[in-house]
From Swiss-Prot:
HAMAP family: eIF3g. It is found in: Cytoplasm. Belongs to the eIF-3 subunit G family. GO terms for molecular function: RNA binding; translation initiation factor activity. This is Eukaryotic translation initiation factor 3 subunit G. Component of the eukaryotic translation initiation factor 3 (eIF-3) complex.
Length: 279
C-alpha cells in the first residue's frame, strides 16, 4: 500500500502525462480542456475554444507556376523566396489607384514651382545692413547698424564724393569687371575697352546658352574673345540677346553676313554691331 506522499507523486505524474481532452462542437469549433498546476501549487482547469479558418489566396496562374520553378546554380538548395546575397531587389513602387492622378501630379508640380520661386526670392533679396532676406529700407537694424554700413535711415546709400564708374555705382550696385578700380584706385575709362569687333545677336530663344552660340554658330569663324548672353538679374533667364566678340573686324563682318536674317531654333536672328561704326 502506497503512502500519501507517493500517491501525490502519482497524481502529479498522471496530471502531466494525461493528454488534453478535445471535444468537437456542432458549430465546427473544438473545445480543448487541459489541467495544469499554477504558481501557487493549485490544480487549474484550462478550457480553450478553437476555430479553424481556412484562408485561400487567389493569384494569377502564371505567378503560381513561377513559384513552383526549381532553383538552380548557387541557389539550387536555397529555400523559397529571394536571397539578398544573390538577388537584387527592385525599388518599391506605390500604386495610386483613382481617377484624380493627373490633378495630383499637377498639384505636386505647382507646389515644387512655388518652392523654387520662394528660394529664388530669398536668394535675390539681401539687406545691405544686416544681410537678411528683406529690403534694406525695411531693415529693423538700420538705425543702429546703418551708419556702419553706409546706409541712411531712409534706406538709401549716400552719394559718394569720389567720381568714376566704381564710385558712382554705390556700394550696393553691381559694377562690371571692366569698370572696376584696380589696386591703385584707378578706374578705366570707356575708351579703354575695344568693342569694334563685337556683334549684338538679338531674337534668341530663351533656352539658348553661351555654349550653343559658341559651338553651333560662331566656332567655325575662329577663336572667340567673348560670348555673353544678357540675363535677368533676379530670375537668371535669358533676355533674348547676346554679345559676341571676334578676333578681327573682318571675321565679325563675315559672321554678320552669314547669320543675319537666318533662322535659329524657330526664331529669325538679327545681328548688328554693338558699337555703331563711324561713317
Amino acid at each position: 500500500m502506497s503512502t500519501g506522499l507517493l500517491d501525490s507523486w502519482a497524481d502529479a505524474g498522471d496530471e502531466f502525462s494525461a493528454p488534453p481532452e478535445v471535444i468537437a462542437n456542432p458549430d465546427g469549433t473544438k473545445t480543448v480542456i487541459t489541467f495544469r498546476t499554477n504558481q501557487d501549487g493549485k490544480k487549474v482547469k484550462i478550457t480553450q475554444k478553437i476555430k479553424e479558418v481556412k484562408v485561400q489566396e487567389k493569384v494569377h496562374p502564371l505567378i503560381a507556376q513561377r513559384k513552383n520553378w526549381k532553383k538552380y546554380g548557387k541557389e539550387k538548395n536555397s529555400p523559397p523566396g529571394p536571397d539578398t546575397s544573390t538577388t537584387q531587389l527592385g525599388e518599391k513602387v506605390d500604386l495610386k489607384l483613382g481617377t484624380s492622378w493627373k490633378q495630383d501630379e499637377k498639384k505636386e508640380e505647382e507646389d515644387k514651382a512655388h518652392e523654387r520661386a520662394q528660394k529664388i526670392a530669398v536668394q535675390t533679396i539681401k539687406c545691405r545692413v544686416c544681410g537678411g532676406d528683406h529690403y534694406t529700407a525695411k531693415c529693423p537694424f538700420k538705425d543702429t547698424l546703418g551708419a556702419a554700413a553706409g546706409v541712411t535711415p531712409s534706406g538709401t546709400t549716400p552719394e559718394p564724393t569720389s567720381e568714376g564708374g566704381a564710385g558712382a555705382a554705390g556700394a550696393g550696385k553691381y559694377v562690371p569687371r571692366h569698370l572696376r578700380a584696380d589696386a591703385n584706385g584707378n578706374v578705366p575709362t570707356r575708351e579703354a575697352r575695344d568693342d569694334s569687333t563685337t556683334l549684338k545677336v538679338s531674337q534668341l530663344n530663351s533656352f539658348v546658352d553661351e555654349d550653343m552660340l559658341r559651338n553651333e554658330l560662331f566656332a567655325k569663324f575662329g577663336p572667340l574673345q567673348r560670348v555673353t548672353i544678357v540675363r535677368n538679374r533676379e530670375t537668371g533667364e535669358s533676355r533674348g540677346f547676346a554679345y559676341v566678340s571676334f578676333a578681327t573686324e573682318e571675321i565679325a563682318q563675315r559672321a554678320l553676313d552669314t547669320f543675319n536674317g537666318k533662322g535659329y531654333h524657330s526664331l529669325i536672328l538679327h545681328l548688328e554691331w554693338s558699337k555703331k561704326k563711324k561713317t
